[in-house]
């Protein structure tokens, strides 16, 4: 199994520090606003990485934090005239609502920065004692800064050089800093800001120290995987490495994994461009499974271009999978006829290779795009096989095994786990179709009667009536089923 390590800038054989045990830390959100599709991508990527490692038999300890104190939280609280705690709690709750709908399994440990102030103070004090950090007087309290030039390996993750960073730095306002690159470990409190007592007086932690303190506490001084979005490589992850390795004298994380951006019209999402897409707004018009599939349809390191037509394509693909499962379930109910026989060596070989091929793709740096392609090719072939009307015992048994394989592979990606009927029920709601399921069933019953009485005009009229509302009818030998039309 190979993973791309941002630290070494190459694909490497994945060898955990402790054989089958894997420690993973992913940087979570700053809880000051609703999550956007970029947060969704990072959450889905690391959710699948954890699921796949567990599928492979690794014992994973997954830690994902909340930054619940930050300038953005304070600014939002001041703007709304409420406490910073209220803002943090409100948006932590909103985060869970979105993530639950996206099918994100909660991390084993989800620490909050404000619950780890003592651990941060201990690291900062050690860094001062070792000469890696220094204090700056701020009235009655002090701020503490990390001295970047004391850590010669600074820039090893982002491949940036200290001298180039210094010469490219903007005009530094604070002359008291030894270098424009030095970053805050502890900030002396300003009037009206939250604060904690510390050896440097009242203040609060800098952003970077929070993740170092929490990851070291729960995963140890050196652990396997540290991850997050590519936007965190510099300065956040670079600063984490510097302060953590200066503190422990040991390597921090063995593998650094970063997911690519979500772009809109080839531009990175940003509030200044006004192109930020909230998860909540998207889940108002699309099923969460379609959004999840869209995010997994590209390799996690590549940028992914958002467009509504791509989500619609993903929705149509999810629909095809559930329709296939529904078809298989219809064949499970048919009367066995062992006289007819269909040649199905090709599709049988595809089933035998399905899991090995899926694993081969996922073992190659979690290539979900390739893995999904393999699954969809198999589903296409299964439908061709069903077009031939299989009816022998061995053929139906094969279809049952195929369905089980689709579900098992889907479970690693948390896709295709619903009953097909629930997929359509949920689409009724998300598409805001102005007809209730009871009414659909009543009209189907009415149409069945009309067909029995050979009243084809009425039967066609009911079909058209439902179609105009976005409901498609499919007549089966023993019944009529309904589906939601995918645009």
From Swiss-Prot:
GO annotation, biological process: cysteinyl-tRNA aminoacylation
Residues that hold Zn(2+) according to the record: 27, 211, 236, 240
SMART domains according to UniProt: DALR_2
Residues that bind ATP: 271
Catalytic activity: tRNA(Cys) + L-cysteine + ATP = L-cysteinyl-tRNA(Cys) + AMP + diphosphate
Gene3D superfamilies: Cysteine-tRNA ligase, C-terminal anti-codon recognition domain (1.20.120.1910), HUPs (3.40.50.620)
Any one of the GO CC terms: cytosol
Keywords per UniProt: Aminoacyl-tRNA synthetase, ATP-binding, Cytoplasm, Ligase, Metal-binding, Nucleotide-binding, Protein biosynthesis, Zinc
Protein name: Cysteine--tRNA ligase
Organism: Thermodesulfovibrio yellowstonii (strain ATCC 51303 / DSM 11347 / YP87)
């Amino acid at each position: 199994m190979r993973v791309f390590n941002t630290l070494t800038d190459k694909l490497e054989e994945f060898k955990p520090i402790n054989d089958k045990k894997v420690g993973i830390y992913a940087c979570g959100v700053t809880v000051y606003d609703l999550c956007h599709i970029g947060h969704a991508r990072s959450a889905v990527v690391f959710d699948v990485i954890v699921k796949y490692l567990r599928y492979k038999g690794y014992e994973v300890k997954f830690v994902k934090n909340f930054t619940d104190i930050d300038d953005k939280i304070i600014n939002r609280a001041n703007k709304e005239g409420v406490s910073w705690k209220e803002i943090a709690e409100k948006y932590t709750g909103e985060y869970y609502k979105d993530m639950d709908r996206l099918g994100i399994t909660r991390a084993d440990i989800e620490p909050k920065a404000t619950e780890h102030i003592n651990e941060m103070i201990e690291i900062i004090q050690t860094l001062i004692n070792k000469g890696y950090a220094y204090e700056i007087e701020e009235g009655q309290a002090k701020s503490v800064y990390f001295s970047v030039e004391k850590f010669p390996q600074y820039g090893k993750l982002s491949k940036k050089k200290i001298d180039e960073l210094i010469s490219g730095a903007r005009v530094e306002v604070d002359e008291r800093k030894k270098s424009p690159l030095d970053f805050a470990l502890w900030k002396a409190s300003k009037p009206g800001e939250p604060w904690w007592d510390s050896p440097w007086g009242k203040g609060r932690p800098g952003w970077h120290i929070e993740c170092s303190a929490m990851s070291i506490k729960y995963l140890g001084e050196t652990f396997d995987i540290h991850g997050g979005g590519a936007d965190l490589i510099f300065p956040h992850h670079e600063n984490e490495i510097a302060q953590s390795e200066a503190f422990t004298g040991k390597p921090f994380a063995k593998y650094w994994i970063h997911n690519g951006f979500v772009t809109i019209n080839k531009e990175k999402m940003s509030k200044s461009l006004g192109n930020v897409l909230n998860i909540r707004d998207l889940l108002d018009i699309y099923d969460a499974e379609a959004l999840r599939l869209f995010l997994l349809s590209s390799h996690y390191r590549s940028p992914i271009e958002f467009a509504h037509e791509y989500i619609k394509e993903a929705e149509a693909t999810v629909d095809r999978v559930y329709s296939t499962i529904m078809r298989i379930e219809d064949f499970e109910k048919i009367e066995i006829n062992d006289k007819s026989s269909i040649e199905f060596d090709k599709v049988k070989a595809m089933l035998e290779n399905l899991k090995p091929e899926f694993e081969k793709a996922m073992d190659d740096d979690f290539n979900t795009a390739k893995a999904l392609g393999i699954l969809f090719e198999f589903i296409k072939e299964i439908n061709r096989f069903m077009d031939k009307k299989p009816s022998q015992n061995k053929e139906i048994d094969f279809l049952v095994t195929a369905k089980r394989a689709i579900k098992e592979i889907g479970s690693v990606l948390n896709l295709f786990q619903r009953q097909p009927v629930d997929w359509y029920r949920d689409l009724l709601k998300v598409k805001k179709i102005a007809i209730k399921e009871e009414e659909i069933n009543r009209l189907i019953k009415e149409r069945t009667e009309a067909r029995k009485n050979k009243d084809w005009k009425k039967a066609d009229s009911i079909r058209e009536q439902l179609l105009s509302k976005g409901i498609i009818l499919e007549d089966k030998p023993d019944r009529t089923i309904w589906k939601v039309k995918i645009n």
